[in-house]
Regions:
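Conserved class I S-adenosyl-L-methionine
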Residues: 26-31
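Conserved phosphoryl-transfer catalytic core
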Residues: 64-119, 123
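Conserved small/polar residues in nucleotide/adenosyl-binding loops
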Residues: 171-176
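Coupling/switch/interface segments within P-loop NTPase motor domains and analogous charged loops
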Residues: 126, 132-165, 169-170
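SAM cofactor-binding core of SAM-dependent methyltransferases
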Residues: 35-86
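S-adenosyl-L-methionine
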Residues: 1-23
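A general structural motif
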Residues: 24-25, 158
Length: 176
């Protein structure tokens, strides 16, 4: 995920320098975690990772990728008739995401503030997302929030779904 200040391209070099200089340790504090690239790299290497950032999107990514250490089961959500089984081999996360992708798009905050149609009244309409992608993001975000409010998501399942939405939304920036 590209983000101002993202260190993804320099992480391997940073690690090489630490090894070359003989700087050893098994824990890392990522002060400006952002997209969690540094934290994820060191977590994969078995480090104990602590991370921090002021941005809420980063907090969601940290909860999903750094704090979370288990595969989500969605045990409260999957038994409901609204989330039908796809294939027996589909993971619980895949089944939930498939359901979310089938929802009928509706206008909301992202559509009204970050799409050409939603901001037609501005002298320069915003084009961060296509109209359709803006609606889809709104629909999925609202459904995730309803599930959270209805106590249908356990542990970090809420953050895993938000992190998935953040990641896929990023890939659709300016996708017209």
């Amino acid at each position: 995920m590209r983000y101002i200040g993202n260190k993804e391209n320099v992480i391997p070099r940073m690690y090489e320098i630490l090894i070359h200089k003989g700087i050893a340790g098994r824990s890392l504090f990522d002060f400006f975690s952002g997209t969690t690239s540094v934290s994820k790299f060191y977590k994969r290497l078995g480090y104990t990772v602590s991370s921090s950032d002021f941005m809420y999107f980063s907090y969601c990514l940290q909860k999903a990728y750094i704090e979370n250490n288990s595969t989500p089961t969605f045990e409260r959500l999957l038994p409901l008739p609204i989330v039908s089984p796809l294939k027996s081999c589909a993971s619980p996360l895949d089944r939930v995401i498939a359901y979310l992708n089938e929802l009928e798009p509706e206008e909301g905050f992202i559509y009204n503030n970050y799409t050409p149609e939603g901001t037609y009244h501005l002298s320069q309409p915003r084009m961060y997302f296509s109209n359709e992608n803006g609606k889809k993001i709104d629909t999925i975000r609202q459904q995730i929030e309803r599930w959270k409010n209805d106590n249908l998501l356990l542990g970090n399942e809420y953050y895993i779904l938000l992190a998935s939405l953040i990641a896929v939304s990023y890939t659709h920036l300016r996708a017209h």
